């Protein structure tokens, strides 16, 4: 087709020139075919004549092919036939030079004009917009979702299974009173830090994590779900955007008025006022709903008012209950029957599928996971998963699941064997090209969008491999130029003398070196002629090649050699005058200015960087113990000052002189009484946690060694398993840092 178009266009131009039709650029029959077609397609044709639009792509290969013929027409002999026309062509040589800029420009530009209307609007804009049209269809499912949110209201009849399920949930309200065990429970908060591995068991757990999405009574899908997050943004203006929100919110507008239908609604929700037990009187006070604003303390009822939605934000304690309901998984251990549900839960996860048989058959519906899109909260997981990643950032808790997610990523193929194996496909994201209709895969191929330049003639893909400019050496005549060209470029002047050996060199191209223009052989290469228009990016090397050596020596030296060198070579000239040790030492160079104060030499301990935080904590522990910091200068005696320090209150007046021996009497005496009053602030409830006393015993025992710290300093050495940097640093301040830190101790003593 291109050959037909080209022949027709050349014939048209040829006939126009014979008939005397000229558009200001084409002047004769022959000049129209070559010089006119090239020069006419430069500027005036695209606007003055329809060739610029349709036939421009055709003239591009013509131009690129015959652009060597800018030097070509004198060799062609048109000057002998058309000397005045040759003058005009020489007058167009500036235009050709301007087109040399256009050779860079139109091949870039008109390909943009050829295919981008198909794709630049599509790839750039559909990810923003076609998800929107595809999403409004799903957004109708959202409109079905607010209606399905009414199935949430109908789901509370299944909320009786929630009432069967809230046995864990009633431990939540019973658990906020146990919230004081939660402050005592921060030792298990370290078990939270130990819990992220169990949070990997959340990764094995997430199959039930969909019950988490169902577990918050679809409440966290409201929070984590971006559309409802928009409802948050629309929710502070609360009514206008909710008025603009689908009709489902109009039941919300009727819903505060039908707040009494909330009281009629509570077949599930009367259990809510029943478990607050104080709120039974509050629903009995529908009129005292005004008494709720009269209750500034019932501002908690205001959180329970917005639909208890803000109640959870007002439950900062229950916000800990949110990580604690991931830990309520541990609360299940604290809840003995559900503790059995724990061991049956992660391993016998299938018993879980048998556990809520009416509920996890929904999880057995992951083949009917489309029903999950129909199921509103999991459908939220759908609009979260087409982004898949943004929705995961919307899972702020599950976003931590992402960090734990890559290691347990295999566990995710175990978990979402139905679908998230597709997220395991993202390496097979080409399956996503197969996964949209492969057309969006083309949209996802804007990098392969150059493959669409390979799409129109498949030659622009060859312009797409100007890296295959080395393929130009693979091209035989330029292959000669490359062996003579790149490094043996000086050898080319040697070949200039042996240039006669060049015609003797390629026996295959003796005729071609006899035709130094080598372009009559190129017209003898009409198929390779098309390869030449496909070859234009290397063609620039061709016009740089007819100069052959002046431009190329300036070009590869200035560009290729420098581009090959600039990281190494520019770094070498830039740094050796400035600082050779700097490029050699750029990391250690920082260590050098940081090294003299010896603190950044401590950053040189970043492997012992735990020793660093242990070191500043001790140093901060000195400001945190400013009295004990003085005890640390007294502490190089290490022992007398601290016995003088703890007993300071009574033992000093009682035993000033026999003090060291009475220090033994003091551990014997205050532990009987004073250590007990000192411990109730430290937690005797912690020793009263013999069940939790394992972790807490390891933890408050760390406090007891702190108070018995000078003698039980070796128990700090037993204490390291919690903080090896800490046991390492109290010793290391004396052992690893003895010359430095003892100099500091000698400083206070000298001070």
Curated annotation (Swiss-Prot):
Residues 109-732 are annotated as: 63 X 10 AA tandem repeats of Y-[KR]-[APTS]-K-[KPMSLTIVA]-[STR]-Y-[PLS]-[PASRQT]-[STI]. Produced by the byssal gland. Residues 21-41 are annotated as: Nonrepetitive linker. Coiled coil: none annotated. Residues 168-184, 678-690 have a biased composition (Pro residues). Residues 1-20 form the signal peptide. It comes from the Eukaryota. Residues 158-359, 397-636, 660-751 are annotated as: Disordered. Keywords: Hydroxylation, Repeat, Secreted, Signal. It is found in: Secreted. GO terms for cellular component: extracellular region. Sequence repeats lie at residues 109-118, 119-128, 129-138, 139-148, 149-158, 159-168, 169-178, 179-188, 189-198, 199-208, 209-218, 219-228, 229-238, 239-248, 249-258, 259-268, 269-278, 279-288, 289-298, 299-308, 309-318, 319-328, 329-338, 339-348, 349-358, 359-368, 369-378, 379-388, 389-398, 399-408, 409-418, 419-428, 429-438, 439-448, 449-458, 459-468, 469-478, 479-488, 489-498, 499-508, 509-518, 519-528, 529-538, 539-548, 549-558, 559-568, 569-578, 579-588, 589-598, 599-608, 609-618, 619-628, 629-638, 639-648, 649-658, 659-662, 663-672, 673-682, 683-692, 693-702, 703-712, 713-722, 723-732. Residues 158-167, 185-262, 288-343, 350-359, 444-486, 662-677, 691-721 have a biased composition (Low complexity). Hydroxylated on proline (mono- or dihydroxylation) and tyrosine residues (to L-DOPA = 3',4'-dihydroxyphenylalanine) of the tandem repeats. InterPro entries: Adhesive_plaq. Almost exclusively composed of repeats of a decapeptide. Provides adhesiveness to the mussel's foot. Mussels produce one of the strongest water insoluble glues. The mussel's adhesive is a bundle of threads, called a byssus, formed by a fibrous collagenous core coated with adhesive proteins. This is Adhesive plaque matrix protein. The gene is FP1.
């Amino acid at each position: 087709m291109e050959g037909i178009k080209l022949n027709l266009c050349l014939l048209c131009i040829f006939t126009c020139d014979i008939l005397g039709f000229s558009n200001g650029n084409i002047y004769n029959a022959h000049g129209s075919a070559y010089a006119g077609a090239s020069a006419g397609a430069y500027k005036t044709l695209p606007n003055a004549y329809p060739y610029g639009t349709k036939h421009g792509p055709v003239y591009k290969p013509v131009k690129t092919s015959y652009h060597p013929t800018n030097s070509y027409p004198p060799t062609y002999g048109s000057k002998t036939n058309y000397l005045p026309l040759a003058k005009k062509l020489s007058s167009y040589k500036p235009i050709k030079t301007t087109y040399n800029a256009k050779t860079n420009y139109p091949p870039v530009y008109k390909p943009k004009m050829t295919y981008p209307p198909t794709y630049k609007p599509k790839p750039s804009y559909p990810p923003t917009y076609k998800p929107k049209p595809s999403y409004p269809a799903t957004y109708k499912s959202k409109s079905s979702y607010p209606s399905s949110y009414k199935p949430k209201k109908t789901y509370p009849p299944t909320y009786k299974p929630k009432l069967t399920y809230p046995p864990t949930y009633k431990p939540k309200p019973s658990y906020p009173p146990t919230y004081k065990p939660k402050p005592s429970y921060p030792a298990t908060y370290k078990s939270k830090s130990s819990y992220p591995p169990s949070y990997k068991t959340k990764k094995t757990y997430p199959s039930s994590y969909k019950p988490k999405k169902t577990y918050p009574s679809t409440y966290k899908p409201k929070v984590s779900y971006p559309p409802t997050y928009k409802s948050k943004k629309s929710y502070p203006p609360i009514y206008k955007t909710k008025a603009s929100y689908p009709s489902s919110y109009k039941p919300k507008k009727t819903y505060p008025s039908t707040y009494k239908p909330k009281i009629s609604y509570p077949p599930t929700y009367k259990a809510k006022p029943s478990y607050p037990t104080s709120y039974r009187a509050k629903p009995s006070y529908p009129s005292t709903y005004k008494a709720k604003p009269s209750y500034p303390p019932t501002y908690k009822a205001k959180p329970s008012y917005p639909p208890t939605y803000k109640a959870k934000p007002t439950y900062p304690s229950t916000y800990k209950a949110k990580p604690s309901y991931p830990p309520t998984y541990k609360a299940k251990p604290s809840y003995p029957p559900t503790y059995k549900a724990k061991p049956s839960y992660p391993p016998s996860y299938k018993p879980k599928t048998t556990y809520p048989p009416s509920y996890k058959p929904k999880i057995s519906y992951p083949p009917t996971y489309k029903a999950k899109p129909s199921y509103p909260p999991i459908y939220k997981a759908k609009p979260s998963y087409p982004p898949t990643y943004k929705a995961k950032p919307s899972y702020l808790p599950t976003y931590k699941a992402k960090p734990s997610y890559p290691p347990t990523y295999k566990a995710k193929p175990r978990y979402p064997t139905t679908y998230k194996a597709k997220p395991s496909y993202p390496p097979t994201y080409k399956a996503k090209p197969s996964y949209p209709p492969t057309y969006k895969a083309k949209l996802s191929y804007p990098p392969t969008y150059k493959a669409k330049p390979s799409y129109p003639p498949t030659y622009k893909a060859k312009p797409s491999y100007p890296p295959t400019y080395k393929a130009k050496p693979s091209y035989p005549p330029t292959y000669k130029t490359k062996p003579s060209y790149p490094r043996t470029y000086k050898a080319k002047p040697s070949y200039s003398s042996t240039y006669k050996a060049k015609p003797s060199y390629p026996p295959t191209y003796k005729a071609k070196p006899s035709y130094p223009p080598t372009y009559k052989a190129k017209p003898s290469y009409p198929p390779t002629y098309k390869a030449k228009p496909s070859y234009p990016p290397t063609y620039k090397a061709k016009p740089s090649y007819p100069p052959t050596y002046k431009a190329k020596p300036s070009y590869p030296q200035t560009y290729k050699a420098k581009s090959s060198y600039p990281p190494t070579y520019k770094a070498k000239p830039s740094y050796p005058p400035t600082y050779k040790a700097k490029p050699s030492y750029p990391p250690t160079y920082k260590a050098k200015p940081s090294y003299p104060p010896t603190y950044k030499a401590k950053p040189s301990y970043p492997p012992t960087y735990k020793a660093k935080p242990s070191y500043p904590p001790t140093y901060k522990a000195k400001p945190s113990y400013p009295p004990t910091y003085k005890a640390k200068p007294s502490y190089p005696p290490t022992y007398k000052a601290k016995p003088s320090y703890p007993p300071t209150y009574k033992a000093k007046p009682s035993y000033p002189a026999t003090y060291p021996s009475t220090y033994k009497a003091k551990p014997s005496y205050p532990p009987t009484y004073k250590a007990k009053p000192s411990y109730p602030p430290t937690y005797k409830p912690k020793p009263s946690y013999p069940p939790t006393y394992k972790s807490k015993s390891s933890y408050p025992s760390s406090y007891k060694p702190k108070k018995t710290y000078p003698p039980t300093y070796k128990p700090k050495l037993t204490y390291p398993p919690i903080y090896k940097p800490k046991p390492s640093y109290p010793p290391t301040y004396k052992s690893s840092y003895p010359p430095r830190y003892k100099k500091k101790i000698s400083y206070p003593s000298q001070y």
